[in-house]
Amino acid sequence: MNPSFYPNQFDCIVVGAGHAGTEAAYISAKAGLKTLLITMNLDTIGQMSCNPAIGGIAKGHMVREVDALGGLMGRVIDQTGIQFKMLNTSKGPSVWAPRAQAEKKQYQLMIKHQLEKLQQLSIRQDTVEDLIVEGNQVTGVITGRGFTFYTNHVILTTGTFLSSVIHIGTYQKESGRIGEPTTKGLSHTLARFELRLGRLKTGTPARVHKNSINFDGLEIQDGDENPRPFSFSTKKIDRKQIPCFITYTNDTTHELIKQNLEYSPMYSGQIKSVGPRYCPSIEDKVVRFAERDRHQIFIEPEGYETNEMYLNGVSTSLPEEVQWKFLRSIKGLEQVELMRPGYAIEYDYVDPTELHPTLETKKVKGLYHAGQINGTTGYEEAAAQGLVAAYNVIRSVRKEEPILFKRSESYIGVLVDDLVYKGVEDPYRMFTSRAEYRLLLRQDNADQRLMQYGYEMGLVEESLYKDMKDRYARIESIKSHLFVSAMKPSPELTKVLEEKQITNYKFGHSLSSFLKRSDIKIKDLEPIVSELSILNEDEKAVLEMEVKYEGYLKRELETIEYRKKFLNFQIPIDFDYASVKGLKTEAIVKLEKHRPLNLENALHISGVDPSDVDLLLYHLVDRH
């Protein structure tokens, strides 16, 4: 029973304070909703349970999208990063991706500090053991210490803590992270509501002592000389950067692992759930990729003030003594000392096809799920979902229409669409290959694509929004100039042509056509086009990309318009899919299960291909 002075009525309650929960609570409270964040330990708010890094391929795109929408992750990593790197710069701009190593503890403390500053946010250390539901509407939560808090909107962000078990060899313990308790009450609650539960597995590598590593002869991986921020509000990164190191497994390592596979919970049958396909354990790598004579390991620092080092690439649940043995067979780690062992963890998740695209459950109104409870893996995927859930809670409280992010405008849209329509068979990780329109969904233009949503919701400052509009107005102005202005002879141009060994150049072509040449970069135009001086380096990079890839961008936009024209065609909720001649049996079963609202949603259901959607389109048009 709550004391009379204890506030117990909230607009939104967020359960769990990992990367989904902190983003959800931040967005909700920032928008003015009276919000309660409940976490089992205040000291682990925003904790990096696995790798001490933010961003990466496609993940960095999502961090920038979260930032453009008013979120927290990008700003905090800019303030706490210890190495910044733009990945994939040797490839096309659609797959360039920012990544940063974090000062792990400082990142966590900064997240907590940002939450504590919000006037509309209350933070409580407790667990949630049950939900109060009247009819099919959530009305509150009951905590482990017996308190009741009331709300019509609950966001569950329980991470890996639902009925979780950790495994190290034959050792098993009910735990959400090593040394932390599990929670079972909510698993029973969700089952009671007939939400489909499943089991997934993830893992983490050992943490080792820096002073026990011999760095001589290891490959050094430095950060970028001129690091680019994640947040559009960060003007410059001026933090001291420290290197990572690279080493490799070898035949001896692999043999030691093979000799001890019977003690691996994954191979002994002790673990029956499915692990992440794209982040396999070292045991899996050795077995599945037996033809490889080595596997790469990144030795990553966890901060300036700690000697803990993270061994990226050797996630394992082998017995602790085996971990010592195989790690000491690796170059640079011959005398390594483990500070924390690697381990695997099994946990409950809820089938995400139980959710609407708002991340609200279909069976319980006002109940939203975000993060690993939806079968995803990764801090960035979690943060994106926390933001989506919070955006839609805000819309609900304000009695406004929900916000549905489209695949054509964001990786966040791709993520949610994949989850709620295709579901997951193993922990879901975002890749650029999952996005059909990835040339439009670049990391550099996330603000142009999404910031208006955040501004209209009151989550992005007017000054930041105005800066964005001014930025793209400048870029568009120069781009128009390049397309309408012809190349003319000049001493500056002659010098560029000589340096590039370009002969017999025909004048009269546009400046844009000159820039489209593979041997010409935007910097080559600077002596010729004085107007470029009004752009900063990032703006010039955007301009160059939009000119060079103009044809591809135009084609993607045309494809989007075509789909808008036809794929938004509504499907009646009681539509008889079996009546469509030629539709595959698998497609009929999947369509009847998911009941998509329109043809675009139908296209994104696993087991339904474009030819099935074409048949549906013809049938629906004939009916009308």
UniProtKB/Swiss-Prot annotation:
InterPro entries associated with the record: FAD/NAD-bd_sf (IPR036188), GIDA_C_N (IPR049312), MnmG (IPR004416), MnmG-rel (IPR002218), MnmG-rel_CS (IPR020595), MnmG_C (IPR026904), MnmG_C_subdom (IPR047001), MnmG_C_subdom_sf (IPR044920)
What is its subcellular localisation? Answer: Cytoplasm
Gene from which the chain derives:
mnmG
Give the range the annotation lists for the signal sequence. none
| Key words, A-Z | Cytoplasm, FAD, Flavoprotein, NAD, tRNA processing
Its assembly, as annotated, is: Homodimer. Heterotetramer of two MnmE and two MnmG subunits.
Q: Which organism is it from?
A: Leptospira biflexa serovar Patoc (strain Patoc 1 / ATCC 23582 / Paris)
| PROSITE patterns given in the database record | GIDA_1
List cellular component terms (GO): cytosol
Single GO term (MF): flavin adenine dinucleotide binding
Which residues does NAD(+) bind? Answer: 275-289
Q: What does this protein do?
A: NAD-binding protein involved in the addition of a carboxymethylaminomethyl (cmnm) group at the wobble position (U34) of certain tRNAs, forming tRNA-cmnm(5)s(2)U34.
Pfam family membership, one:
SAM_GIDA_C
Q: A GO BP term, please?
A: tRNA wobble uridine modification
Q: In which family does this protein belong, per the annotation?
A: Belongs to the MnmG family.
Query: Required cofactors, per record?
Result: FAD
Name the Gene3D superfamilies for this protein: FAD/NAD(P)-binding domain, GidA associated domain, C-terminal subdomain, tRNA uridine 5-carboxymethylaminomethyl modification enzyme MnmG/GidA
- The name of this protein is tRNA uridine 5-carboxymethylaminomethyl modification enzyme MnmG
> Where's it mainly located?
cytoplasm
